[in-house]
Design a protein with these regions (language model features):
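Active-site loop/helix belt of alpha/beta enzymes
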Residues: 1-14, 68-82, 87-186
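N-terminal active-site wall of soluble small-molecule enzyme domains
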Residues: 1-58, 62-71
Length: 186
């Protein structure tokens, strides 16, 4: 690839201050070249690894009740590291179910302990703009966003950015588009 450190440096120079990575090791490498960046771990975290994430101020994207429970119980008093909440709005692969999201939103004590900085979902069919699932996911995400007032939201992945501004919410997550991928039919 292009190398995580050179890419992170270039993105910081261009004004990017939020990153999404898959693995903690990638987050640590970005932290070394972008000390002030907000870094999310899309794959959540391995049970028992909360302390390491807190040490490097890496924010897990929580996508299961077990991850929610462990992160809420983690001692973050000296390092107030936040998290993101991932809700499955139709991809049927990652994230809390809508029922789990509603339960979390109602559990005010747990929600306060988590201190979520972002609510996300992932578009399953954004690379096919006319696919009806895009609209269904948008509506589902709007509904779940209402459950978490004041928490910034992110729905658009690379292809989702090209679906239009209504999919952008507070933060778009360009990934492969940064490297020139094109998402257009015809």
């Amino acid at each position: 690839g292009a190398g995580i450190e050179p890419v992170a440096r270039a993105l910081v120079a261009a004004g990017c201050n939020t990153f999404f990575v898959a693995l903690p090791e990638e987050g640590v490498r970005i932290r070394q070249v972008a000390p002030g960046a907000v870094i999310y771990l899309l794959d959540g975290f391995v049970p028992g690894s909360a302390e390491a994430l807190i040490e490097f101020d890496l924010r897990p994207v929580l996508g299961s009740p077990a991850e929610v429970a462990e992160w809420a119980a983690a001692d973050r008093r000296d390092h107030p590291t936040s998290c993101a909440i991932h809700v499955d709005t139709g991809m049927n692969r990652l994230g809390l179910t809508m029922a789990e999201a509603r339960a979390l939103a109602a559990a005010r004590g747990t929600l306060a302990a988590l201190s979520p900085a972002l609510l996300i979902s992932h578009l399953a069919c954004a690379d096919t703009p006319a696919h009806p699932l895009n609209r269904r996911q948008l509506e589902a995400f709007r509904a779940v966003r209402d459950l978490f007032p004041g928490v910034p939201a992110s729905l658009a992945n690379s292809a989702g950015i090209f679906l239009g501004p209504e999919y952008h919410f507070d933060l778009a997550r360009p990934g492969i588009a940064l490297y020139g991928a094109v998402f257009a039919e015809g």
